UniProtKB/Swiss-Prot annotation:
Pfam families in the record: Ribosomal_L2 (PF00181), Ribosomal_L2_C (PF03947)
Species of origin: Akkermansia muciniphila (strain ATCC BAA-835 / DSM 22959 / JCM 33894 / BCRC 81048 / CCUG 64013 / CIP 107961 / Muc)
Quaternary structure (record): Part of the 50S ribosomal subunit. Forms a bridge to the 30S subunit in the 70S ribosome.
Gene behind this protein: rplB
Any single Gene Ontology cellular-component annotation: large ribosomal subunit
Keyword tags: Ribonucleoprotein, Ribosomal protein, RNA-binding, rRNA-binding
Region feature (Disordered): 32-54, 221-278
Family statement drawn from the similarity comment of this UniProt entry: Belongs to the universal ribosomal protein uL2 family.
Any one Gene Ontology molecular-function term assigned to this protein's record: transferase activity
Chain intervals with Gly residues compositional bias: 232-245
NCBIfam families in the cross-refs: rplB_bact
Top-level lineage group: Bacteria
Protein name according to UniProt: Large ribosomal subunit protein uL2
UniProt entry tagged with the keyword Transcription: no
Function: One of the primary rRNA binding proteins. Required for association of the 30S and 50S subunits to form the 70S ribosome, for tRNA binding and peptide bond formation. It has been suggested to have peptidyltransferase activity; this is somewhat controversial. Makes several contacts with the 16S rRNA in the 70S ribosome.
Length: 278
């Protein structure tokens, strides 16, 4: 996957850096694996905004991606590499030997015609799914289950990878993309390789309109609002914390800069090293 820049013949082209889509082999998704996707506009069932900056955007179909990879010991062939509007990485359409089709996340290096398989004793090559206990140490993996059989939850975004660093007492120690080291049950399945579309982080939309196509609305700074609209609003000119207020706050009045992680969270028992450990 590569990026391409454009001659600045228009203002929107000056800073635009878009993917080349060279790896995409078809523009038509598998109809049997698509479902309708309804927009909420960031509102709940009462019509109130629960998530800001959501609204509009192009109509999408949801692709049913197989995160469990629980069709064991049946080889599959990669038919296509496709764009998925609902995630940052590409997806691959695979067809099993018995004729069943499914979508999986497309790791770096996966190409049309390659064979992939899921099982206990499969080879540790790109696209294969296997339990953590059988993955060689130092291997890059993605789509990792938190509980056996629950389906992959960790390291699924574009360019993400986790490293199997060690094993102890029925657990595998995984170095997460954030740098955190966490214990996973070694019976949890994962997929070998790094998630594709590794240059996604370097994309630039070039104009506000493309961001709106993605369903993202503008973000207005609280400092520029009135006091009735935001705790940081009001004051004369560019007042840092509003008229007479002492601390920057969230829209709901919580002071910025405080730790938000809940004390005695159950996952504390599986975190060996925090991501910000010195």
């Amino acid at each position: 996957m590569s990026l391409k820049s454009f001659k600045p013949v228009t203002p929107s082209n000056r800073y635009k850096v878009w993917p080349s889509f060279d790896e995409i082999t078809t523009s038509t998704p598998e109809k049997s694996l698509c479902r309708p996707l309804k927009k909420s506009g960031g509102r709940n069932n009462n019509g109130r905004i629960t998530t800001r900056h959501i609204g509009g955007g192009h109509k999408r179909k949801y692709r049913l991606v197989d995160f469990k990879r629980n069709k064991f010991d049946v080889p599959a062939t990669v038919l296509t590499i496709e764009y998925d509007p609902n995630r940052t990485c590409r997806i691959a359409l695979i067809e099993y030997k018995d004729g069943e089709k499914s979508y999986i996340l497309a790791p770096t290096g996966l190409q049309v015609g390659m064979k992939v398989e899921s099982g206990q004793k499969v080879a540790p090559k790109v696209g294969n799914a296997m339990p953590l206990k059988n993955v060689p140490l130092g291997t890059s993996v993605h789509n990792i289950e938190i509980r056996p059989g629950s389906g992959g939850k960790v390291a699924r975004a574009a360019g993400q990878q986790a490293i199997v660093s060690n094993r102890e007492a029925g657990y595998a120690l995984i170095k997460m993309p954030s740098g955190e080291i966490r214990r996973f049950n070694e019976d949890c399945y994962c997929t070998i390789g790094q998630v594709g579309n590794t240059q996604h982080m370097n994309e630039m939309s070039g104009k506000a309109g493309r961001t709106r196509w993605m369903g993202v609305r503008p973000t207005v700074r609280g400092m520029t609002m009135n006091p009735v609209d935001h705790p940081n609003g009001g004051g004369e000119g560019k007042s840092k914390s509003g008229g007479g207020r002492q601390h920057l706050k969230s829209p709901w009045g919580h002071v910025k800069g405080q730790k938000t992680r809940r004390l005695r969270k159950p996952s504390d028992s599986v975190i060996v090293q925090r991501r910000n450990a010195k």
